[in-house]
Amino acid sequence: MIAYDKSYDVVVVGGGHAGCEAALAAARMGCCTLLLSINLDAIALMSCNPAIGGLAKGHLVKEIDALGGEMAKNIDATGIQFRILNTKKGPAVRASRAQADKQQYRLRMKRILEHQDKLDLKQAEVTSLLVEDGNVVGVDTKAGVRYLGKTIILTTGTFMRGLIHIGLTHYPGGRAGDLPSVGLSVSLEECGFKVGRLKTGTPARLDGRTIDFSRLEPQYGDNPPIPFSFSTDKITQSQVPCHIAYTNERSHDIIRSGLDRSPLYSGIIEGVGPRYCPSIEDKVVRFPEKDRHQTFIEPEGVDTVEVYPSGLSTSLPIDVQWAFYRSIYGLERVEIMRPAYAIEYDYVDPIQLHASLETKVVGNLYHAGQINGTSGYEEAAAQGLIAGINAALRVQGKEPLILGRNDAYIGVMIDDLVTLGSKEPYRMFTSRAEYRLLLREDNADLRLCEKGYAIGLVREEEYRRFHAKKNMIEEELQRLRQEKLLPSEADDVFMEEFGLTGMQNAMTYEQLLRRPDIDSRELARIDKHIMEIPAAVREQVEIQIKYQGYIDRQLEQVERARKLESAKIPGDLEYAGLPGLSAEVREKLQQFRPDTLGQASRIPGVTPAAITILSIALKARNGR
């Protein structure tokens, strides 16, 4: 191996969504950083759906933005349709989603990386890790070059021993058009990591010129479009519609006829697929009572005719793909430009990680993204950001940034991964968060911007803007608590409409706004000032007032849980020597090796009684 003549603080392996955030975070925090990618033309490529956000995923993007990451800004600059989902539900589950111009998204992110100080980009395939005295110190590449780094971040996506399946045909690939990484998995196994196998898939890309869109239902975005980033004032690019289509009984018969040549159902694919993003053949087999399945026909960009049929991923043979796509109403003459396929790949069970995303097996080595068993661009980007931050903090000799389950969806996800591991592709849902009323999209900046600024990621201008917003919220809350509606001065129509005609005592505007039938627009009939403040401030004030009781209750729950989360469990604790623990509990604790009592309490089979025993043992140990 030829040693490269420059050593780095942080080396990031992989240029997908996790790798981009990791590299940018480390470089922006002042670390000399190297990003290695098998293909520099595929930086931040959207391998599957051309969209960012969605339920719970939008929360992750907002949190990435609040901490100083790039994903939200990138989609704001390249999005071609923006929508807020769940608008008729409570604020905890409302979510942002945007269609992306796939090529513009990739190209802009590459430009950001290329112009970032202290960041080098190189095209290379990493084949092995260089480990000395239990710590990683560099990586070796297929071209025979060795790159040395104080910390290494692996963000390998689906590339490790990737195997693509189309019907009974299969061939090595990291994704369609890219070669796999064939040596790194072996190197990880030699280091002592447990490496598993997962599977995912993607639909065909269709020629939009061969689709009769007049026979499909159009779906338009919000007008005006609402940006993801707290620093984006407005979306300026042109917006386009998506279209809705449906499979039918004929489609399902065609799919069933091809199952004998499906790698999924013939036993060829061994990897576990994503539970919450099943292939179309999986849907047809698992839900035989359904006579149709919905698909969104999504444009891949404004300068291409390619479209993405969401929800129709498959690994069926190409002739079956031709037939079933053409069985859909409006798609009878459709041409496939790129076939659908499934891909198997290696991953490393994240139970082998600390909450910082540093591995427990090898020091100074961090894992982020699909290597940890997750699925989705947003999940990957969030992990990449945290891995990049913590690698930089390690180089700087500082404590890692650990987000708790009460801090962010990012914290929920990482805690799930490192506490429970992953045997199937992990996807974020709002239902995974026990404090979801505290972890809303709208308050991500209030929760995390201070942390991002403290570590040097949030720029000064953005921080001043955040602080001004925060002050305005506090001032408006204070004003609404003080200003009152007096019975003698009340508007009769307003009073009658909201059942206040018998009111004897004055009511503060806060008390009025707390009522479910009065929102800020209604309050503006008697309080003109409330409509003069920015919409984001007004939204935050209204949510805090209307949901204060529920928020206070969740804050009490957080405080009770905080004691468990702060109780550290030493890595060398011998569970076998603790009296009172059952054999099952000992086995679970030995297997999962939790870092805190909080983590231990979330391991299935570890009882409250066992946590009490552990707590007593830790107090006794610390007292010695």
Curated annotation (Swiss-Prot):
The UniProt entry, under InterPro entries, shows:
FAD/NAD-bd_sf, GIDA_C_N, MnmG, MnmG-rel, MnmG-rel_CS, MnmG_C, MnmG_C_subdom, MnmG_C_subdom_sf
Q: Quote the subcellular location field of this record.
A: Cytoplasm
Main subcellular localization, coarse class?
cytoplasm
Record-linked PROSITE patterns: GIDA_1, GIDA_2
* GO CC term (a single one): cytosol
Quote the record's binding site residues for FAD.
G14, G15, G16, H17, A18, G19, V126, S181, Q370
Q: Which domain of life is it from?
A: Bacteria
Question: Do you know which Pfam families this protein is assigned to?
Answer: GIDA (PF01134), GIDA_C_1st (PF21680), SAM_GIDA_C (PF13932)
Q: Is the keyword tRNA processing in the record?
A: yes
Q: Where does NAD(+) bind?
A: 273-287
What keywords were assigned to this record?
A: Cytoplasm, FAD, Flavoprotein, NAD, tRNA processing
Q: Which cofactor does it need?
A: FAD
- MF terms in GO: flavin adenine dinucleotide binding
Q: Which GO terms describe its biological process?
A: tRNA methylation; tRNA wobble uridine modification
Recorded hits in HAMAP family, A to Z, give:
MnmG_GidA (MF_00129)
Give a short account of what the protein does.
NAD-binding protein involved in the addition of a carboxymethylaminomethyl (cmnm) group at the wobble position (U34) of certain tRNAs, forming tRNA-cmnm(5)s(2)U34.
Subunit structure comment from the entry:
Homodimer. Heterotetramer of two MnmE and two MnmG subunits.
Q: Which family does it belong to?
A: Belongs to the MnmG family.
Protein's recorded name? tRNA uridine 5-carboxymethylaminomethyl modification enzyme MnmG
Instruction: Name its species.
Output: Geotalea uraniireducens (strain Rf4)
**Gene transcribed to yield this protein:** mnmG
